[in-house]
Amino acid sequence: MAVARVSQIIGASPHSWEDAVRNALERANRTLRGITGIEIVKENAAVESGKIAEFRATVNVTFVLEGT
């Protein structure tokens, strides 16, 4: 039986929440192996001069632990 772990990370993008999620997953793929899914926990944005300056997405990344 496999054992999984969840790691929460925050991705950011100047363009969209979708890009922020994509950036979070791309970053997670650089250091985590065996990613099986993601859950978008929260979306928020930084505002400057009355406009969205940065889209942010908090994401739970689920991955299977090796050797289990």
Would you name each region that the model predicts?
Residues 1-2, 68:
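Compositionally biased, disordered extreme N-termini, encompassing classical targeting presequences
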Residues 13, 42, 63-65:
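Flexible glycine-/small-residue-rich
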Residues 49-68:
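C-terminal structural segments of small proteins and small subunits
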Residues 2-37:
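Short, well-ordered alpha-helical segments
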Residues 38-46:
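Short, conserved loop-to-beta-strand elements that form functional interface hotspots
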